[in-house]
């Protein structure tokens, strides 16, 4: 695979990710369901080596770049197994993707001081279009509940309507493992 230099297009970066990614401590970050790699490139620009995982080889080709290791894995295939060891990642980033059977293993892959940034669609999004299948929509408070159930400390959580990049109902969370230093969670000023 040819590595090419790609600029980070800050207009396409999730505002949630842009806001909270600076909390991720030094170390490797997983961009799960990375698509074309917009967030992977942003994370590299912050100094992190990134594993960009997706099931689509064409998307991974677009995601490839300096500091990014691409990984072609279909985590929804029958018999699929989570490919990463517990405690591996300083950060895990997921946007616009939900496959509930992955959650426990994914959270276990966070380092003791790791940061989880997750943003995806919620029930009610049907009124705005796809996804509309309940399998791909979080129930009210679901993301917050599973973060707490898995021992994460919530730094920020939102559940509601967004207008950008298109109107949608979403839930999003910034949560940290228990060893994350509380003083490091510098909250942005408005």
What are these regions (language model features)?
Residues 110-112:
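Helix-to-beta-strand junctions that scaffold the AdoMet/dcAdoMet cofactor pocket
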Residues 135-151:
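Short alpha-helix
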Residues 27-35:
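Conserved class I S-adenosyl-L-methionine
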